[in-house]
Curated annotation (Swiss-Prot):
Pathway: Protein modification; protein lipoylation via endogenous pathway; protein N(6)-(lipoyl)lysine from octanoyl-[acyl-carrier-protein]: step 2/2. It catalyses: [[Fe-S] cluster scaffold protein carrying a second [4Fe-4S](2+) cluster] + N(6)-octanoyl-L-lysyl-[protein] + 2 oxidized [2Fe-2S]-[ferredoxin] + 2 S-adenosyl-L-methionine + 4 H(+) = [[Fe-S] cluster scaffold protein] + N(6)-[(R)-dihydrolipoyl]-L-lysyl-[protein] + 4 Fe(3+) + 2 hydrogen sulfide + 2 5'-deoxyadenosine + 2 L-methionine + 2 reduced [2Fe-2S]-[ferredoxin]. The gene is lipA. Residues 53-270 form the Radical SAM core domain. GO terms for cellular component: cytoplasm. [4Fe-4S] cluster 1 binds at C41, C46, C52, S281. This is Lipoyl synthase. It is an enzyme of class 2 (transferase).
C-alpha cells in the first residue's frame, strides 16, 4: 500500500466531460461480459473509458485479468493467473466482427508463468482476427516477456501485427520504484529486436508523466527510443487509480505537452501523441493514420 502525504488538486484541464447517454457504454460492457472478454479500459480504470466506449471502441486485454507483477501505478489485479482460455482467440475475433471494428488494439497482463510470456496466445488471436476480419488492422501492446524474449519474438514474427507497441512507461531512475520486475534496457531491446525482424512495421512506445521524473529525463528516454528505432510515441499524464496507488507528483500543462511533441518530431518520430489524456491505445486508429490526438 502506498502512503500518500499530500494529494495535489486536479487542474481544470483534467476535468472529464461525460457523454449525455451511457447507452453505448452499457452495450460494450454487456458485450464483453457475454463473451467473457476483458478490456484494459475497465481493468485499469482508464479515464477515457466513457469516451471510448461511447464511440464504440475498446482495447481488448487477453490472457486473463490477473497479472503476475504488482506495479504500484497500475490498477490491474495481481496474483496467480488462470490457464489461458484456448477459446479466447475465436471469441475475440467473433466479437470484433460483431462490433464492426476496422482497427483493434490487443494488450495483455504480464504472464511470467508461461514459457513464452504469452506470445503464442497473441499470435493465435492475430490469426483468428485476420481469418474473420481480413481488413481489420491489428495493434498489439505487449509486456516485456521477461526471461522469454527470444522465444516470444520468434513466435510473434510468424504472424506479426500491423503495429507493435511496448510501453517504456517512465524514466530509468524511477524504474525500481514504479516498475519492480521490469528493466529499462530490456524494454528498449524488445522494441529494437522486433524492428530488426520487421523493418517495415511501425514500433511504438509510451510514457506516463507526473511521477517524479524531470523534463530532461523524459527527453533522454525519447532519444533512447529513437536510437532503438521506435517510430511512434505517446506521452500522457499519470492519474492515480485509487488511494492505494502511487500519488501524482506533478500535473503537466497542455503547453508542456505541446512542447514535448515538437521535441519528439524534431528527433525523427514519425508520429507523436502528447496530451493529458493520451494513452498508447487512445484513438489508436487515428494515431496510425497520423491524425493529431491529444
Amino acid at each position: 500500500m502506498v502512503k500518500i502525504e499530500k494529494k495535489l488538486h486536479k487542474p481544470l484541464w483534467l476535468k472529464i466531460k461525460l457523454p449525455s447517454s451511457d447507452y453505448k457504454i452499457k452495450v460494450i460492457k454487456k458485450t464483453m461480459n457475454k463473451s467473457s472478454l476483458y478490456t484494459i479500459c475497465e481493468e485499469a480504470c482508464c479515464p477515457n473509458l466513457a469516451e471510448c466506449f461511447n464511440n464504440g471502441t475498446a482495447t481488448f486485454m487477453i490472457l486473463g485479468n490477473i497479472c503476475t507483477r504488482r506495479c504500484p501505478f497500475c490498477n490491474v489485479a495481481h496474483g496467480r493467473p488462470l490457464i489461458p482460455d484456448i477459446h479466447e482467440p475465436e471469441k475475440l475475433a467473433e466479437t470484433i466482427t460483431n462490433m464492426g471494428l476496422r482497427y483493434v488494439v490487443i494488450t495483455s497482463v504480464n504472464r511470467d508463468d508461461l514459457y513464452d510470456g504469452g506470445a503464442q496466445h497473441f499470435v493465435d488471436c492475430i490469426r483468428a482476427i485476420r481469418a474473420k476480419n481480413s481488413a481489420t488492422r491489428i495493434e498489439v501492446l505487449v509486456p516485456d516477456f521477461r526471461g522469454h524474449m527470444k522465444t516470444a519474438l520468434e513466435i510473434l514474427n510468424t504472424s506479426p501485427p500491423d503495429v507493435f507497441n511496448h510501453n517504456i512507461e517512465n524514466v530509468p531512475r524511477l524504474y525500481r520504484h514504479i516498475r519492480p520486475g521490469a528493466d529499462y534496457h530490456r524494454s528498449l531491446k524488445l522494441l529494437k529486436k522486433f524492428k530488426e525482424y520487421n523493418p517495415s512495421l511501425p514500433t511504438k512506445s509510451g510514457l506516463m508523466m507526473g511521477l517524479g521524473e524531470t523534463r530532461e529525463e523524459i527527453i533522454e528516454v525519447m532519444r533512447d527510443l529513437r536510437q532503438h528505432n521506435v517510430t511512434m510515441l505517446t506521452l500522457g499524464q499519470y492519474l492515480q487509480p485509487s488511494s492505494n496507488h502511487l500519488p501524482v507528483q506533478r500535473y503537466i500543462t497542455p503547453q508542456e505537452f505541446n512542447e514535448m511533441k515538437l521535441e519528439s518530431l524534431a528527433m525523427g518520430f514519425t508520429y507523436a501523441a502528447c496530451g493529458p489524456f493520451v494513452r498508447s491505445s487512445y484513438h489508436a486508429d487515428l494515431q496510425n493514420k497520423g491524425i493529431e490526438v491529444k
